[in-house]
Amino acid sequence: MLQVYLVRHGETQWNAERRIQGQSDSPLTAKGEQQAMQVGERARSLGITHIISSDLGRTKRTAEIIAQACGCDITFDSRLRELDMGVLEKRQIDSLTEEEEGWRRQLVNGTQDGRILGGESMQELSDRVHAALASCLELPQGSRPLLVSHGIALGCLVSTILGLPAWAERRLRLRNCSISRIDYQESQWLASGWVVETAGDVSHLDAPALDELQR
């Protein structure tokens, strides 16, 4: 059985400002750095062998902090990037027009072909994050990888493993530096392949922060 841990990046400046990030970027806050250190402390006891991270700055920094604690090398994979949110990236949520807010709501309310102008659909996101996950099956026997990615990306990954469509209503909360675990297994009482063991664990954090889409 292959165990894969999933970690959302630490709190960023734009999270705190309720600003849409997508594939744009902002640095971790002091709280975000502390959250990443707490993940590192937890990960040190999990036997992590590989860290694979989105190549955006906020995930790279989170991965670097975790890697220092684990003593692991980091591989960067652009397929683990956040959903491309097109023309709304860098905008504060409270500043959106009614039309723009309608685009954003399509990403959370179950609109099958929803997307922000200039951005990705949830199905496109799902296809690439699943491709990144499938690469973990090529790691050496006994590996235990930890993937560092983003809130919508990881939420889509976990939800689709559970059998939901990529565009399903968004009802899974993954806070900054939460830890989830998925396993690739063969069981008599579970469907073969990927299963969800835990999702959104924040028991290792002193004060989990809310992101801009969860307030």
From Swiss-Prot:
Active-site residues, Swiss-Prot/TrEMBL: 9, 82
GO terms under cellular component: cytoplasm
GO annotation, biological process: glycolytic process
GO molecular function, one term: phosphoglycerate mutase activity
Signal sequence coordinates: none
Keywords: Glycolysis, Isomerase
Family: Belongs to the phosphoglycerate mutase family. GpmB subfamily.
Protein name: Probable phosphoglycerate mutase GpmB
Species name: Salmonella paratyphi A (strain AKU_12601)
